[in-house]
């Protein structure tokens, strides 16, 4: 099995006043495992599955979620194929399967905040989301545990859908698990920001961030793509990542301010979203 790269692979030396760098960062997980996920021992044979998704195991919650998403995607295609697109369900099918439609959420169809996490718009959409969420999710599960992984995936994913519904309300239909996927990316970016002062190979980290931003750019276009949800998931995931690392021994000097800001953001976002979705006159 491929080794999951830890934060110590990026860190050069303990910051002043800290001697626990190597011990703390070796608890699994790494910044942006999507692009620099693992290291293999010399002569180790790694299967293509382990190369694509290091540390994969079928009992992982993220794997189970992925299988459910595949089943839902196949069912949505069976319900109706969109013309002139590659294996894409029709808009009517997306509505039937619970797409994010703010006007319907306002009248009580609350399930439309979570159902989009299992929907995909076309073949490229589901393949990209599955690869990213499995690759990052496995690393997050190793570091934070499966319960926290699920809390971030569904909690921040639903919150991002709420933000999207609050911002783009009238005549909108949005779908896709990308809001939750961007939440996972946000957590990884937060980790990277928190250990930046201790990173030895910053060039690799910069390349990783650039590739991440390219993914953000590419994933934000297309019919029914939820660009606001992507940004909401990324920002709220970043805030969650700041909070999740409060016990780190290599926190930067600005951590306390960042933690307070993240807590305020995570508390205010659902309240403001509910106000704009359910109380503020729209359309």
From Swiss-Prot:
Annotated catalysed reactions: Cleaves type-1 transmembrane domains using a catalytic dyad composed of serine and histidine that are contributed by different transmembrane domains
A GO term, aspect molecular function: serine-type endopeptidase activity
Entry GO terms, CC: membrane
Spans through the membrane: 62-82, 114-134, 149-169, 179-199, 205-225, 227-247, 260-280
Ranges for region Disordered: 1-26
Compartment list: Membrane
First-tier enzyme category under EC: hydrolase
Keywords associated with the record: Hydrolase, Membrane, Protease, Serine protease, Transmembrane, Transmembrane helix
Residue spans of biased composition, Polar residues class: 1-11
GO BP annotations, alphabetical order: proteolysis
Family, similarity comment: Belongs to the peptidase S54 family.
UniProt-listed PANTHER family: RHOMBOID-LIKE PROTEIN (PTHR22936:SF69), RHOMBOID-RELATED (PTHR22936)
Role: Serine protease involved in intramembrane proteolysis and the subsequent release of polypeptides from their membrane anchors.
Name under which the protein is recorded: Rhomboid-like protease 2
Native source organism of the sequence: Toxoplasma gondii
């Amino acid at each position: 099995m491929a080794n999951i790269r830890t934060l110590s692979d990026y860190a050069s030396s303990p910051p002043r006043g800290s001697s626990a760098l190597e011990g703390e960062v070796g608890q699994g997980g790494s910044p942006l495992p999507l692009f620099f996920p693992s290291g293999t021992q010399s002569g180790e044979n790694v299967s293509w599955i382990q190369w694509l998704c290091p540390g994969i195991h079928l009992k992982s919650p993220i794997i189970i979620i992925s299988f459910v998403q595949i089943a839902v995607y196949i069912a949505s295609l069976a319900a109706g194929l969109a013309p002139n697109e590659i294996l894409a369900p029709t808009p009517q099918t997306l509505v039937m399967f619970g797409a994010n439609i703010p006007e319907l959420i306002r009248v009580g169809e609350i399930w439309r905040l979570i159902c989009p996490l299992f929907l995909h718009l076309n073949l490229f959409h589901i393949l990209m989301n599955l690869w990213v969420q499995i690759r990052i999710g496995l690393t997050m599960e190793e570091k934070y545990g499966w319960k926290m992984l699920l809390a971030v995936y569904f909690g921040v994913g639903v919150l991002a859908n709420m933000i999207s519904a609050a911002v783009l309300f009238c005549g909108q239909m949005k779908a896709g698990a990308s809001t939750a996927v961007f939440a996972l990316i946000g957590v990884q970016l937060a980790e990277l920001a928190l250990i930046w002062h201790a990173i030895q190979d910053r060039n690799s980290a910069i390349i990783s961030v650039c590739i991440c931003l390219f993914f953000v750019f590419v994933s934000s276009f297309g019919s029914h793509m939820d660009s606001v949800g992507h940004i909401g998931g990324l920002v709220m995931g970043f805030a969650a990542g700041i909070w999740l690392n409060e016990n780190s021994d290599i926190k930067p000097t600005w951590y306390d301010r960042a933690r307070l800001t993240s807590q305020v953001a995570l508390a205010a976002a659902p309240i403001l979203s509910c106000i704009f979705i359910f109380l503020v006159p729209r359309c």
